[in-house]
């Protein structure tokens, strides 16, 4: 290998993986992402406040219990390119965190809980979306299928309704019995969930999807109630006053084609 090519590979590797890992912020600075109150869980969760999201991280499982973040309409059309800067979270002690190597050769994606596409309006927050404390093992068909479809739909809702959303995604799992991968013993969740709250209408949609090798990409097939997710996870969610946790409201319209055109018009590329 030429010296030039070797140097180029080193530069590329450094640019992708060696970004500025800033210390977590005080947790109360993330109350903006939980305006109705923090969700309560009986799991051994460590609250970590990042620039643009709050993660309740389960160190024994080495995956998030849940994450909460705010998605403003103007931020749903971010233009910073995807970096794939997956990296272990340096704020967590040894033995309490996952690394990209834990996923290698397992057949599972390093699956985002807070999606990169919702964080691409700022370089620092885009990088922080690739912290391994924001990942869980996800089968490719789930991560790149219906889960990705839901992520795009959430962005479309923010832009097309022109409303700020509170989004709470997370994992469904049993740390004692679920499969583990990698040297660190990363728990493979049984499924994923997402709650989306419209801060103007005080409506809440909820979805849950199982880890399956094959499933349709129709997000409506995974619609559940918030109460269902509470039963699946043991988490108690704080919602706007008057929201019925047992309800399954009509899913909001989402024009993904229009979202892609808006993204291309602003950034020169599709969603």
Predicted features and spans:
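Domain-level detector of nuclease and nuclease-like folds
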Residues: 90-271
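Generic hydrophobic, helix-prone segments enriched in Leu/Val/Ile
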Residues: 2, 32, 86, 154-156
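Sec-dependent signal peptide recognition
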Residues: 2-9
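N-terminal module-boundary/linker segments of secreted carbohydrate-active enzymes
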Residues: 17-64, 244, 250-251, 266-271
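N-terminal signal peptide c-region/cleavage motif recognized by signal peptidases
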Residues: 13-15
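Short, His- and charge-rich active-site/binding loops that engage polyanionic ligands
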Residues: 47-110
């Amino acid at each position: 290998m030429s010296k030039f090519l070797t140097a180029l590979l080193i530069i590329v590797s450094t640019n992708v993986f060696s970004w500025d890992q800033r210390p977590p912020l005080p947790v109360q600075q993330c109350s903006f992402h939980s305006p109705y109150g923090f969700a309560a869980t009986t799991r051994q969760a460590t609250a970590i406040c990042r620039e643009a999201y709050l993660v309740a991280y389960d160190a024994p499982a080495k995956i998030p219990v849940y994450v909460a973040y705010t998605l403003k309409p103007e931020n749903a059309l971010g233009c910073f390119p995807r970096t794939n800067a997956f990296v272990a979270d340096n704020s967590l002690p040894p033995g309490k965190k996952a690394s990209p190597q834990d996923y290698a050769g397992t057949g599972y994606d390093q699956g985002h809980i807070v999606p990169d596409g919702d964080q691409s309006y700022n370089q620092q927050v885009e990088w922080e979306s690739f912290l391994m404390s924001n990942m869980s093992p996800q089968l490719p068909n789930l991560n790149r299928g219906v889960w990705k479809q839901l992520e795009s739909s959430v962005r479309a809702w923010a832009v097309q309704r022109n409303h700020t959303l509170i989004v709470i995604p997370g994992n469904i799992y049993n740390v004692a019995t679920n499969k583990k991968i990698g040297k660190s013993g990363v728990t493979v969740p049984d499924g994923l969930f997402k709650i989306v709250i419209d801060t103007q209408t005080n409506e809440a949609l909820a979805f849950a999807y199982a880890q399956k090798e094959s499933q349709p990409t129709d997000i409506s097939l995974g619609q559940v109630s918030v109460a269902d997710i509470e039963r699946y996870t043991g988490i108690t969610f704080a919602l706007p006053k008057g929201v019925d946790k047992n309800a399954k409201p009509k899913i909001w319209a989402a024009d993904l084609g229009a979202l892609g055109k808006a993204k291309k018009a602003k950034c020169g590329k599709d969603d």
